[in-house]
């Protein structure tokens, strides 16, 4: 009985409400694995450049989480960005190549900002930069973002 009480006590002692994390996802288009002045993969000395000077990227990489094994699900940028936003492959989110009326299904998909708000409604989300909406002009706000720089038409 004493062992049970100790286990229950210890399990409740360490239950502390953690603050929600700040999440900043920076995605660069056509970023080379060796296009920065720091090791993209600390285990591989070939994963940096002595030519490029990227002190701000280096500082971010040193103080944040670094993803070293990312693979594009498509050979061009739009379906890749939409896969990151939804966690789905292009075959599942239905954007594979420019075509009209593809956004009908896409607008219904869960996205990172929508999921964050489901977990905690006080999350504030924003999107700045490339927003490719060649057809149907769906907006970042429709995908769950609170703030954006709008349709950038690229």
Task: State where each predicted segment sits.
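Formylglycine-dependent sulfatase
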Residues: 3, 16-154
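Sec-dependent N-terminal signal peptides
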Residues: 4-14
